[in-house]
Amino acid sequence: MASSGHSDLGEVTSEIKASERRTAVAIADLEWREMEGDDCEFHYGEGPNEAQDNDFPIEERSRLQEMLFLLGLETYQTQKLSLQDALQISSDSMKNWAPQTPKDLPWNFLRKLQALNAEARNTTMVLDLPLDTRPVEKESQMEEEIIYWDTAEDISADIYSFSELPTPDTPVNPLDLLCALLLSSDSFLQQEIVSKMSLCQFALPLILPDPENHYHTFLLWAMRGTVRTWGSQPPRVMGSFREDSMVLSRAPAFAFVRMEVSSNSKSQLLNDVLSPGHRQQDCFWHRDLNLGTNPREIADGLVEISWFLPSGREDLDIFPEPMAFLNLRGDIGSHWLQFKLLTEISSAIFILTDNISKKEYKLLSSMKGSATKYYFILSPYRGKRNTNLRFLNRLIPVLKMDHSHVLVKVSSTDSVGFVRRVRAIITHVTRSPCRRVSVEDMANAARKLGLKVDEDCEECQRAKDRMEQITRKIKDLDAYRRDELRLQGETWRKVAQVEKELCQIQWASDPPEKYRAELRHRLLELRMQQNDHDPSWGVQEFISGISSPSLGEKQYFLKWMEWGLARVAQPRPRPSPEMIFTLRPKHCGAVDFSEPFWPEPLGVEHFLREMGQFYEAESCLVEAGKLPAGQRRFAHFPGLALELLLKGLPLELIDGNTLSPALRWVTGLLKELHVRLERRSRLVVLSALGVPGTGKSTLLNTMFGLRFVTGRGRGPRGAFMQLIKVAESFSQDLGCDHILVIDSGGLIAGVRTEAGERFEREASLATLIMGLSNVTVVSLAETRNIPPAILHAFLRLEKTGHMPNYQFVHQNLHDVSALGSKPRDRRQLLDQPSDVGRATVQMEKQGDGIQTLADLAFWDPEKQHIWHIPGLWHGVPPMAAVNLAYSEAIFELKRCLLENIRNGLSNQNKNIQQLIELVRRL
């Protein structure tokens, strides 16, 4: 058996040399005969477009329309399917059902992909027939009666009818479903699909065939959102983990293709190469999987890509460095343009075939002079072996091969040893000088061959140019914040402090009027200082970008800004998570990954925060009568930001630096939302609170397909909100038109800092968010460790009588065996030690009467459920498989939340006007 660690080339060298000797002897025994017939040169098309048109015969042009009609996607060819269409809440969001017709397949795929369900690619359909029409076993109709056979009658096939459940007439190949869905989606849904597929460890579509329009599309834009983290060997104490966009990261590329017929499964071989010995991982869909042998109607010509990424542990890693693996679906002769691209970007190409004849020789001899290494994996027919050897002997000098480049795999071949040998070849290639390419490099090569690149549309390029103009001026993050984002400096912190004091004395029984007047005067002076500034050049360019009349260009610009700002930010070296867990004291609970290792990044939210401060300052002066309403310059800012919220961008509700809400800005946003939604303004507010590193944001993203920032050190420090649309057909049943989801920053898990300023701010943050919410999800690192800020908020809200529905979630981040909700752990949470409870109660000056959650008056174990969620990964990332139990548990939690909303357990749903009043009051 091969070691689960890195491949050892020396271990396999003897096998390769023995094979070389056997192959050399076989060729030497053959008498070389010159090939008969015409000249063997292969003439490539005069131009790339001509070659591309020939990739699809004319009679295949209707196949796409037939497939789209079968899947119910024909209406999305002019008006593409959007991300908002795919994410809206409907009655199907609460059902865990198998697709019954082909028209169910696209939506089933999108729902399961959003939930990171490893079964998303399964296109098996189950027909749901009425009970009276279902075939049943005859004996079941007779209960316990004895069956007597009439000897005069023959036993007919009817006795098997109970097992002959009807199956769909038209099974759909999973790759056809993927291609049809991508061709029916806009650029942003395509990007979301590819990003989720990457998280599920599925192979990603790189070149999308389009048999209707005869143009293949290189999916560069769709790949832009794919970001992965991997380790290095040997691991270093600091900086041993690297996070990068897979579009920009360079790695050796290896392509696997089929020539004519191959008895060996190319995709299965790829999976074997990428999978550790103890666990099979099906990155590439192959013939041995369900419906894998079903004929492909529109997916031939698809090129997929997947990466091997090391964990930094030699005992686990198959290869010591990242590597890209490409897979061409279909025969290279029918998809020559894709094959030619693969020869220009790959370090080595493995060609699987059963036979090499004159036709194949013509094709391959045209690659003379190629710098790529070629390897053949043969499974020859008995009567064709001599022919194969003859043509191989001619190809060896043409493709600069030697006999070690020919591998034979037949049914009797040891599969484990063969995979070990292929890995050894790949390792050998990477140890010698070889090309390393990024997806951007691949796209450049594709352009030269005439392939369409999805990123080359005018809207996308204009947005990219504007982003580059902004980010080009960012040399130092601290200096840029100080000089360009001036309203977020010390003045804003003073404003937040004054507003906090005003809020505190507002609730005092006998507020001192003189002190209140002083605070208001001080606040007005600070706001006047802010209003004296004009937006900097960078902020003005940002405003121009989101003010574009083209909705597509606006969305492209926001995406480009996210990536551009991420590239210019220079994070501090990242230690491995294991190192942090090793160094931290055991009593510290969950790790706060935000400091001291990661500085605050620069993101789109900082530009929007600057806009919010200009709006706040101007509104304050108008309210005080210091500025005529007709002279307002920034009154349109909330409308611009609202457009982004409606298109799925998280907007900041509470500033992460001061943990203070920009009241006028948030109110302005909600007023704009009320106007925009008109009659469909009934809201349910769902929030999530918890300590850092508990998977809270990932949980929300998985449950609803949201875009909250995830990852240690990058999560929100304040609170962000996103809006989910409820389908009109379901809104009456659910009782709301939209769900507003709030994701908060991490809260302190320990008790030692309770008396500090940070705890007070976090308690206020938790109180505000929970006070706005109908449903609150509390994410815990341990069942016995509830953040004191949350307990503090419980006590405050209990006075107001506002008690949302609470769901406690404990994510088992390191153990995939945690299943279900355990009564024993629920009891532990209810009866957890009273240190935190007593300390919190003492701050509220309510004595020692309340010591656990179970002592709180609002607590109802039947309504406040405790969930134990298994870990997301089954194994060690980055090559770990997604844990199916995680997806299933998240779906059950989502269904419970929606059921509680529908059944009214989440308290009275709000309209936007009521939410505005709550924000002001809290």
UniProtKB/Swiss-Prot annotation:
Main location: cytoplasm
UniProt domain VLIG-type G: residue ranges: 680-920
PROSITE patterns the UniProt entry points to: G_VLIG
Pfam families according to UniProt: URGCP (PF25496)
Region: Disordered, residue numbers: 1-20
Record-level Gene Ontology MF annotations: GTP binding
Subcellular location: Cytoplasm; Nucleus
InterPro entries linked to this entry: G_VLIG_dom, P-loop_NTPase
Residues bearing the modification Phosphoserine: S3
Keywords: Cell cycle, Cytoplasm, GTP-binding, Nucleotide-binding, Nucleus, Phosphoprotein
Family indicated by similarity: Belongs to the TRAFAC class dynamin-like GTPase superfamily. Very large inducible GTPase (VLIG) family.
Protein name: Up-regulator of cell proliferation
Species the sequence originates in: Bos taurus
Gene that encodes it: URGCP
